[in-house]
Amino acid sequence: MNEIRWRVLHQLRNFFIAQGANFCFVGAEFPLPLVGRDATIDLLFMHRGLNCLLAIDLHLGTRQPDIQKSHDEYLAIIDREVKKTHENPTIGVLLCADKSEEIVEYSLERSLSPAQVAGYHKYLPTQKALQEKLHELYLRYIAVTEVLD
């Protein structure tokens, strides 16, 4: 992982930890048990209040069309292989940033009722807050990249 990406992930980790004591950091570049290839989730947290894992997948640069499919596959692996039986389904956060936009997508709906999804949102940073943070970090990322080029 390049140093700039690592710095962005470090700042995102700090952002989530600053959201309160419910966010417990589990790991960065957390390895996922996939047969035949190496795979990692960028940041993994445990949310104590929601009793679930929060998996953050960061993509800087041009968004690839299969990102959502890979993200969903990773969430299924985490639910099957990493989460404990007493924990709720994993929440996924897909963060994509390029020169034109920042995209923040929560993956909550896989096995939750609409009422549960609404309840979860009050414990998580808003999409707008995450977009603003991602925009700030991406601008910093672009500035550093341009200086290094």
What positions do the PLM features span?
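Charged, terminal alpha-helix-loop-beta segments
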Residues: 1-149
